[in-house]
């Protein structure tokens, strides 16, 4: 589904760097515990700093919460159902301004079919970033 969503807005999968906040899957696909996120967060921070992205699209609530808190958007935080598809701008530690776009995780559409249409609309928001590449 992710490849399909990227293709729908003209972004080749090869142009996207995808990583996870927790680097190994929690048992039985449970939500990650706070101590697991804390353990792996420095690795994610270093990946982001090395790549210096112009846009971070968070997939799911755990990455949304971490990234928005980490990069000074904690005052904008709300449930993913309220802020998905919105664009937030923040200044990164290296001085660049970037956009952060919270999105539902594509896997959520497996369990909740109406989210597929929501994801398609939310990905459309990022189409303008492709044009301004």
What are these regions (language model features)?
Residues 1-133:
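A polyanion-binding, active-site-adjacent surface
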